Regions:
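Juxtamembrane intracellular "pre-TM" segments in multi-pass secondary transporters
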Residues: 34-68, 249-251
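Helix-to-loop junctions at the C-terminal end of transmembrane segments
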Residues: 111-124, 209
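Intracellular juxtamembrane helix-capping segments at the cytosolic ends
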Residues: 165-179
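Helix-loop junctions at membrane interfaces in 12-TM secondary transporters
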Residues: 144-155
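Short amphipathic helix-loop junctions that connect adjacent transmembrane helices
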Residues: 81-98
Length: 251
């Protein structure tokens, strides 16, 4: 739609098509009915729920260490807006090139879900979190050392697969900590902290890009990803193993 020569018409048609496809997907959700949970906690006020948070974190140290590690690793997302800008400076971007790079990013993320899902079923989401973080680190480093057209396509495929595995595992692993009744609170805590970190990251990335260049953004993002992954590796045990140990059986 955009073609070799970028134009307002090409971009407009792209946005309209994206709007139509997104609307179709959202409308299809109207037919989905939420299943009835086996147990439901007694309804309490928001203030009462907030007062329970410190006790929840104290009683589940593994989860507490996890969401801190996740927040640190999420800071690594600061590089996401700058990958395409760096690629534009290094190889130049036409509509066709942008389409190919976006296609590699999207398709790698889509197909990798099958691989990440198989790994999660067999070994748990913790391993997916670690592997996807390391893949993200490798892809970012490759973009720095070999900014050619072919390598850029490969790098964006790696980033697409890594980001998809990271997002899926970082959210899904929360479901495996602790008891079922406090699961919504754990999800809220982990997502809130991660989104705060995800919001701060691009601001820091923008400042680094302005003062020191895009390379500094990627190096800093790699640092956060490595630190987050190391914290999970050394201080967050596999939740399934913890649950099996607490119940006296192996799942």
């Amino acid at each position: 739609l955009i073609g070799e020569e970028s134009s307002v018409t090409g971009y407009s048609l792209t946005f309209i098509l994206a709007f139509v496809l997104t609307t179709m997907g959202l409308v299809s959700l109207l037919a989905v009915r939420e299943p009835q949970p086996p147990t439901v906690r007694c309804r309490v006020s928001l203030w009462e729920q907030l007062k329970e948070v410190p006790e929840l974190l104290q009683n589940d140290r593994a989860f507490t260490r996890y969401f801190v590690a996740r927040a640190i690793a999420t800071m690594g997302r600061m590089a996401m807006p700058f990958y395409i800008l760096y690629a534009g400076n290094s190889i130049g971007l036409s509509g066709v090139t942008l389409g190919i790079i976006t296609f590699s990013f999207t398709m790698a993320g889509t197909i990798s879900n099958l691989v990440w899902g198989a790994i999660a079923d067999a070994r748990g989401f913790r391993l997916v979190f670690l592997l996807s973080s390391m893949l993200w680190v490798v892809a970012s480093a490759m973009l720095l050392i070999a900014p050619t057209y072919g390598m850029t396509v490969v790098v964006f495929a790696g980033i697409g697969a890594a980001s998809q595995g990271f997002e899926n595992s970082s959210r899904s692993i929360v479901l495996e900590f602790g008891d079922r009744d406090n699961r919504p609170a754990r999800i809220a805590i982990a997502n809130t902290v991660a989104q705060v970190a995800g919001s701060i990251g691009p601001l820091l990335g923008g400042a680094l890009a302005t003062w020191y260049g895009y390379e500094s953004v990627f190096i800093t993002a790699i640092f956060f990803l490595v630190v987050g992954a190391m914290l999970v590796y050394f201080y967050v045990p596999e939740p399934r193993a913890l649950r099996a140990e607490s119940t006296g059986r192996v799942t």
